[in-house]
Amino acid sequence: MSEPRTTSQGAKYIPWDTIPLEPLSPLLDRQFVVGDNIMVARVLLKKGCIVPEHHHVNEQVTYVLSGALKFWIDGEVIVVGAGEVLCIPSNLPHQAEALEDTVDLDVFNPPRADWINKTDDYLRGEK
């Protein structure tokens, strides 16, 4: 396992396997890395996991690495499968369900303060 390090100019190298998984519910775990103006999260959802409707000021890009997520956005259903990307503008309400065991990368600009300070109660629970 490689160790995280920062260069003299501030570039950060952080292997995922050095970041502890944060369990949010029995069906949802995550890890994240925060830069100055951006954040990337590795999210692991078990089949049936529901991310309740919410919105945030952060622009979001979700890239599904494996599995599939069903999103409800603006009255539409969008299924995002492995290798596919969904861009969600700032303040747009959205909800998701894992159709199968899924791993995705979520990128946020700016970083999610509620995730960093653990006030993201909508994610913490049984589903």
Regions found by a protein language model. Give the residues of each.
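Structural motif
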Residues: 61, 68-70, 77, 93, ...
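A cytosolic small-molecule/anion-sensing beta-strand core signal
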Residues: 65-66, 81-82, 100
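Short, conserved beta-strand element in jelly-roll/cupin
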Residues: 44-46, 56-71
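Short histidine-centered beta-strand/loop micro-motifs
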Residues: 24, 31-32, 43-44, 51-56, ...
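Ligand-binding loop in jelly-roll beta-barrel domains
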Residues: 90-114
